[in-house]
């Protein structure tokens, strides 16, 4: 599904969360190659990407590194596992592909935001629902699309990605 990440990040119900992070979070610039999250370590923060590109990788049991996704400007990033279960280590490493400006916030502050009232708590449900839909679409794409189709989808989402990475 083309541009599903953007549809998820720009979901109308998540606008409040985005604004909260942008108003109360901390802005930093990740340099190319700098890691935001490390596989196997507990990550206590999530972020909104102002501009730039982040790559998600996972190291398998044999030590091979697999690229499992990207997030782009205008999207959320972080370890959903840690948001749901705070002591759960990250399943992926998230690193900057190019200089990337993000606004991050500790998950504890995000949880305080969610706990403000029932209506805001529903935002957490929306976040988890949208994350599930995103992952389900990616799973279906992985099984149903050819490598070429996945490549074209990535180019459609981010036409200038070839300036930052080598696509094999």
Question: Whereabouts are the PLM-identified features?
Answer:
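Cytochrome P450 core scaffold surrounding the K-helix E-X-X-R motif
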Residues: 58-63
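Glycine- and acidic-residue-biased ligand/ion/polar-headgroup-sensing regions
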Residues: 44-57, 73-74
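Cyclic-nucleotide recognition modules
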Residues: 67-125
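Polybasic "coupling" helices that flank or enter modular domains
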Residues: 96-97, 108-168
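Conserved short histidine dyad/triad with adjacent acidic residue
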Residues: 26-41, 71-75
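Well-ordered beta-strand positions
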Residues: 29, 47-48, 95
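Cyclic nucleotide-binding regulatory module and flanking cytosolic helices
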Residues: 1-27, 81-82
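A short beta-loop-beta micro-motif enriched in histidine and acidic residues
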Residues: 23-24, 35-45, 64-65, 87-90
């Amino acid at each position: 599904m083309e541009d599903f990440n953007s549809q998820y990040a720009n979901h109308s119900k998540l606008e409040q969360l985005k604004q909260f992070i942008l108003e109360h979070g901390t802005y930093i610039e990740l340099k190319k190659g700098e890691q935001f999250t490390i596989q196997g370590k507990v990550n206590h923060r999530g972020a909104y990407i102002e501009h730039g590109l982040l790559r998600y990788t996972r190291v398998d049991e044999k030590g091979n590194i697999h690229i499992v996704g990207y997030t782009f400007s205008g999207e959320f990033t972080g370890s959903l596992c840690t948001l749901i279960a705070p002591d759960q280590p990250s399943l992926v490493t998230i690193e900057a592909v190019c200089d990337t400006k993000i606004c991050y916030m500790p998950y504890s502050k995000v949880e305080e935001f969610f706990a403000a009232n029932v209506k805001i708590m529903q935002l957490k449900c929306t976040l988890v629902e949208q994350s599930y839909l995103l992952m389900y679409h990616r799973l279906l794409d992985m099984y149903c699309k050819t490598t070429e189709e996945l490549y074209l989808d990535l180019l459609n989402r981010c036409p200038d990605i070839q300036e930052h990475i080598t696509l094999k």
